[in-house]
């Protein structure tokens, strides 16, 4: 008999709300009797934008802006139907992107 697994990948710009969402998912899965692996922190993706400070000249004067994308991975092993239902009803913050693979 093959083991069933749900892989949940979370992304957010703020690590605090990301960790809170991961804790909610882990708590829900444990409460319904499923096995948990994670949350596993994945590498943080940094995107840097460099722009000129002045509108026309002075190319040596530049400003850099950075955007960080934090990621977490959670594996739910042998989920029950109750686990899937409770994960669907879970209310998570709007700043968290959720990717689910079965």
Curated annotation (Swiss-Prot):
GO terms for molecular function: structural constituent of ribosome; tRNA binding. It comes from the Bacteria. GO terms for biological process: translation. Part of the 30S ribosomal subunit. It comes from Levilactobacillus brevis (strain ATCC 367 / BCRC 12310 / CIP 105137 / JCM 1170 / LMG 11437 / NCIMB 947 / NCTC 947). InterPro entries: Ribosomal_uS10 (IPR001848), Ribosomal_uS10_CS (IPR018268), Ribosomal_uS10_dom (IPR027486), Ribosomal_uS10_dom_sf (IPR036838). It holds the Pfam family Ribosomal_S10. This is Small ribosomal subunit protein uS10. NCBIfam families: PRK00596.1, rpsJ_bact.
């Amino acid at each position: 008999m093959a083991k069933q697994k749900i892989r949940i990948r979370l992304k957010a710009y703020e690590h605090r709300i990301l960790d809170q969402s991961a804790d909610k998912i882990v708590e829900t899965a444990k409460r319904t009797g499923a096995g948990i692996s994670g949350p596993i922190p994945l590498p943080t993706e940094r995107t840097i934008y460099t722009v000129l400070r002045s509108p026309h000249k002075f190319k040596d004067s530049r400003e850099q802006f950075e955007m960080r994308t934090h990621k977490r991975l959670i594996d739910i092993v042998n989920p029950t139907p109750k686990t899937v239902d409770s994960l669907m009803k879970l209310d998570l913050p709007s700043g968290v992107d959720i990717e689910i693979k079965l």
